[in-house]
Amino acid sequence: MIAEILATGNEVLSGTIADTNAAHIAQILEAAGIEVRRHTCVGDDLDHIAAAVTEICARADVLLVTGGLGPTGDDLTTAAVARAAKKKLVLDPDAEHSMKTYFVQRKRSMQPSDAKQAMLPEGAQCIVNDIGTAPGFMLAMGHCHVFVMPGVPHEMKQMLETGVMPRIETLQGGGRLYAASRTLTVFGLPESTVGERMAGFGAALPGMRYGIRVRFPEIFIKVSTRQPDSRTAQDLAGQACQWVKKQVGESVFSDAGLALEAEVGRLLVSAKATVAVAESCTGGLIADLLTGVPGSSDYFLFSGVTYANQAKVDVLGVSPQTIETHGAVSEETVKEMADGVRRVAGATFGLATSGIAGPSGGTKEKPVGTVCIGLAGPDGVQTSHVCLSFQNRSMNKRLFAFLALETLRRKLL
């Protein structure tokens, strides 16, 4: 079954409002084994909406439309669908009843403009809106079934779940395909390298698809398939997952789509370990990442942004002589920072960073992009020194934080 999604509204078309509806609908359809071919957006124009509906219905099995069902003059979707289907608008008893019930339950008066929402294309099936005024509807146009829903996200989600998907599943009948997917997370490789290593995917795994997306500095690889039965789909997804791990290598750290901070948290829980962080160049970003994971209070104990040298001395017990001799950005300093924060917090591990995020502050010996990382644990302190610059302060800080988290992750393996 081939599906397309059509969003209507000037605000969506102009980018004033982000179209989160399309993303949600696509995820639900994919989970049901339905292939989503296109997302389309048009403004509040009767002719444009009608033309888009006509065009899409010529190539799709189902069309899901959002927006334009309200009582105002710019709510044109119902009329546009009727025009595309060459149907007249008629008062739908079910739509009228659901609207009256909505207003009575809330002790509100139904306005004359609201009655417009009960007018549906002739032959349409009303889809009741349990939490709003505007009913949705389903209308067959040749081989394509059109489902029209409100643009308000919570109303759309409710209608999609209770009124639209059950009808689509009925349309699928015995021809339903079952979807399975896995998402693998990568850190430490550029996107181009990951793409090169994925080059043989299609030949090695017929019937599987993959997609790559980047959320700097992580890369997510999603493998997916649609098969006649769920067991086959899941087995193929598992095989694809193993293939990706082998081809991409140890830079793959999760096959459950976890972000690095979540994977570190999982490993800390598994090890019954705790962590404390002393940050200089990352400015609290590591702590923010770790505490953004639900349940992080089980393993995250303490964070200190010891930006000034004196703070490193006063809070962490770093020797002034160490800073004077080696500088704040040095393996010697982060060694004492990591050891100090571990001691102060009583944590299993102490993690520390000090570096030069830029755009200024670099020297020939320590250019912008230099970061030193220290990790103190039960078996001592390890340090590392890396120089990787993206000539962007925010990106450098984020990269430094992930390098530190990766250091901890590898220690926990």
From Swiss-Prot:
Q: Which SMART domains match?
A: MoCF_biosynth
Name the InterPro entries for this protein. CinA, CinA-like_C, CinA_C, CinA_KH, Competence-induced_CinA, MoaB/Mog-like_dom_sf, MoaB/Mog_dom
Q: Pfam families per the record?
A: CinA, CinA_KH, MoCF_biosynth
According to the record, the signal peptide region is none
Recorded hits in PANTHER family, A to Z, give: NICOTINAMIDE-NUCLEOTIDE AMIDOHYDROLASE PNCC, NMN AMIDOHYDROLASE-LIKE PROTEIN YFAY
What the record says about family reads: Belongs to the CinA family.
What protein name applies here?
CinA-like protein
Naturally occurring in which organism (per UniProt): Desulfosudis oleivorans (strain DSM 6200 / JCM 39069 / Hxd3)
